[in-house]
Amino acid sequence: MRIGTDIVEIARITKAIINGEMAFYERVYTSHERLLINPAEPDYERASGFWAAKEALVKAIGCGFRDGVRFQDIEIKHDAAKAPYFVISGRLQEIFIGQGLQNNSLSISHCRTHAIATVIVY
């Protein structure tokens, strides 16, 4: 079992979204996530939480965003109780399985200025 945590300033992600426009959205967020964030009226807190969650996951796995691992390999969805969970694909899924990992748990939270995510992989 391993743990990963990430915290990000919401202002940082807000700036990246505003300055990067659709290029940032398309690089970092899946089409499902982009619908939840809503580019017409962006939910910067949610976008920041998703960013922190993806960073926390690669920290828990210990691989980072290199060697073919992309932000798009990680999708955040919500179950019937609105709890977030990951759908992992691509190179990251290969690494996850290759390390003998089978499951994960995700928690995301935010306040006015920061978003934080904690991930446990096991």
UniProtKB/Swiss-Prot annotation:
Localisation: Cytoplasm
GO biological process: fatty acid biosynthetic process
GO cellular component: cytoplasm
Cited InterPro entries: 4-PPantetheinyl_Trfase_dom, 4-PPantetheinyl_Trfase_dom_sf, ACPS, Ppantetheine-prot_Trfase_dom
Superkingdom in the source lineage: Bacteria
Top-rank EC class of the record's enzyme: transferase
GO molecular function: holo-[acyl-carrier-protein] synthase activity; magnesium ion binding
Chain sites annotated for binding Mg(2+): 6, 55
Keywords: Cytoplasm, Fatty acid biosynthesis, Fatty acid metabolism, Lipid biosynthesis, Lipid metabolism, Magnesium, Metal-binding, Transferase
Catalytic activity of the protein: apo-[ACP] + CoA = holo-[ACP] + adenosine 3',5'-bisphosphate + H(+)
Classification via SUPFAM superfamilies: 4'-phosphopantetheinyl transferase (SSF56214)
Enzyme Commission (EC) number: 2.7.8.7
Cofactor(s) the record lists: Mg(2+)
General function of this protein: Transfers the 4'-phosphopantetheine moiety from coenzyme A to a Ser of an acyl-carrier-protein. This isozyme may be involved into a specific lipid biosynthetic pathway that also includes Z1545, Z1546 and Z1547.
The family this protein is said to belong to: Belongs to the P-Pant transferase superfamily. AcpS family.
Record's protein name: Probable holo-[acyl-carrier-protein] synthase 2
Organism expressing this protein natively: Escherichia coli O157:H7
